[in-house]
């Protein structure tokens, strides 16, 4: 739990952010930024793990080839960059018994090795921090990212679809801590 992040954010460890990728289509407006990301390589955040050429060939970015790849990319390429602050993700806790157990959060890259959410968001996930396993998914198309943001964002799902009461609220230790 992390009471210092927004209800719409999920704290993602840098180690995980380097494995999860977001496809970025290269165009004349972002080519400079994507070249810098490629030159960072796959081991430094923010970096990139792969590029996809317009003919569909996928190339892994390594320390040995990152300069060549940065020179090669042009409009039409896709760079599979690391997850960065503000990217849309979908957080899930099994079992998914209702739609509220999968909601969209914005990534916030943080140190340490655990996923973090605000305490007020634990109710829909039925999370109690006793070793719960949470799954983080990254939508891979612009359409999926927009759909997740519009339909699944925590801020758009504060009321329960079942009985209309707020499900983003203080509960258990949160209330006790506020009293103390």
What are these regions (language model features)?
Residues 166-180:
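Short, conserved secondary-structure transition motifs
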Residues 157-168:
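Flexible helix-coil linker/hinge segments at domain or subdomain boundaries
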Residues 1-158:
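Core mixed alpha/beta domains of very large multi-subunit molecular machines
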